[in-house]
């Protein structure tokens, strides 16, 4: 079996193998019978083998289609014990190798949900119960995204949404701050998408009281985009604007956004989009995730007692702890490797507390030390300050 990328969902409870429902193999699998006694269930990310003549007979009968669970038991009962047939069918159902046939189970979307380990009926119910409105701020792509979402089963509406998807040309667009305040006041979830440019972005989900807000995100992004931060702080006047600033290049960004949003809704927002930005690099053809942390001291959504930047600092309390003998000649309570593993999600050129982390090459192979390549200087107010900081 290859790596499993599924979300964990509970197994089936209904004993379908005693019903009149017609079984079919899960739509994410192509199924091969290897005589005399092996069956291969093949997908791009998972491969399974079933062994035994009973599984070969079941696979052939299910693959032909049209027979109910009850009919399968009756027909195969001529050659195999009834209890063994029931046991094999139960195993196929519990592992979701086999599902009950439905009109919508033959499509590519059904195969995708099955690849996630998500029952089709659950995905369809979640998609049906979440109304999505598309809103654009000076950027194209709204109509295309709406059509792509609808094709995946998302319920796109013009009013009374359960989720608002806002398209922008820049995540640091000043008008987004007002939208953030409104959603925080209304306690309504929303999501950002930047379909334009050569580095399109999707997410994260902003769910007031549950996740980070846009102010949390903008604080991190501004510190990682020093030049853009300067342009926003000083009276800079745009005399020419790149066509890529407000226009999509191809359909990659729109389709990525549609799939990620539909996946989040179908799984009841149990995906990385809940607390990550998904970025697409159209130059290097790579996709990356960037963690978005909820800041306890955020002036918009943080804890009331921590919002005042002039508050009295809490004293640091030192206490006894175990120490590790290190080959570097010093002592630590936690190894460098363990520290990096714990805080790796906070390393990002987009949203990280540290933009990049690199391992220090050393002659001693047991040394595992790292250094941060990050600009920790304060926000520049002039071009000269920016040059000095960089």
Q: Where does each model-flagged region fall?
A:
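Conserved, charge-rich beta-strand/loop surface module that forms ligand/interface-binding patches
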Residues: 2-49, 170-173
